[in-house]
Amino acid sequence: MKRIAIDAMGGDNAPKAIVEGVNQAIEAFSDIEIQLYGDQTKINSYLIQSDRVAIIHTDEKIMSDDEPAKAVRRKKKASMVLAAKAVKEGKADAIISAGNTGVLLAVGLFVVGRIKGVDRPGLLSTIPTVTGLGFDMLDLGANAENTAKHLHQYAILGSFYAKNVRGIANPRVGLLNNGTEETKGDPLRKATYELLTADNTISFVGNVEARELMSGVADVIVSDGFTGNAVLKSIEGTAISIMGQLKQIINSGGIKTKIGASLLKSSLYEMKKTLDYSSAGGAVLFGLKAPVVKSHGSSDVKAIFSTIKQVRTMLDTNVVGQLVEEFAKETQVND
């Protein structure tokens, strides 16, 4: 049985969306147990009772403006912190939260702990593409500054995730840069390019420009955290703007516009599905001793369900356990 600890109080739509997502997951998957951390009364108002769902009551929760390090030290009874402690103590196998990203990163590092040999765990997310296959990108903001060694490790981590969780036999790895030529980029990108080219354990396809990301040019995209986060927000914002503008044009148009939209309904639905991040799951702080997954702050029921499904796959494939073994081998070789 896979045991998943969930911060029921994190996110814009908590606890309603969180609990209703849990209800759907419990019905869909018979091999999971959920531990919900938060206000018992509020949780119970949405929960469909099940012997595979436990509520661990606490009145304390992490706020959106809490400073990460201080919150971990001072709010020891917060729902997010208690969920992470359950993982550390072996009472749960993974943690999910839609709450404060910075605090979750701190909780992941200080409570759950990083895998020996991993210098900087990276925030990894699967982003939809026009091909429908998506790509994994990291770092998406766990670290504002990185070295070439960090980015090289992200390529290894991303490839490992793509192989074991998404089932891609030989993931193509691209380096996000301001041009495709190998001479392009700042010193960080140039040094990273050399390391990736020299590593024959990964399938490096070279530099990738931001405009190529959505076409599925690579299965894994590597970036420093600052740039990666900015690109992710741009993709999300563009997708939301496109769908919003289409809706506005259709609603404000005449009868011909509405008839045309009706005829294109299935195509527009497929387009929306392609741009919809909610079905892709959450962002994994990959490189820790257990799955620590950040669901989007505005997650709805579908997004929470998808994140639970994602974590279930991670536990089913034992991707973290395999990663621990992989880095243990590398550490022995380097020693």
Swiss-Prot record:
UniProt keyword Transferase present: yes
Molecular function per GO: phosphate:acyl-[acyl carrier protein] acyltransferase activity
Name of the protein in question: Phosphate acyltransferase
E.C. number(s) listed in UniProt: 2.3.1.274
Cell compartments where the protein resides: Cytoplasm
Lineage: Bacteria, Bacillati, Bacillota, Bacilli, Lactobacillales
Similarity remark: Belongs to the PlsX family.
Cellular component, GO, one term: cytoplasm
Protein keywords: Cytoplasm, Lipid biosynthesis, Lipid metabolism, Phospholipid biosynthesis, Phospholipid metabolism, Transferase
Family matches, as HAMAP family: PlsX
Catalytic activity: a fatty acyl-[ACP] + phosphate = an acyl phosphate + holo-[ACP]
Function: Catalyzes the reversible formation of acyl-phosphate (acyl-PO(4)) from acyl-[acyl-carrier-protein] (acyl-ACP). This enzyme utilizes acyl-ACP as fatty acyl donor, but not acyl-CoA.
Subunit structure comment from the entry: Homodimer. Probably interacts with PlsY.
Signal peptide range in chain numbering: none
Keyword check for Lipid biosynthesis: yes
Species in which this protein is naturally found: Streptococcus pyogenes serotype M18 (strain MGAS8232)
GO biological process terms held by the UniProt record: fatty acid biosynthetic process; phospholipid biosynthetic process
Pathway: Lipid metabolism; phospholipid metabolism
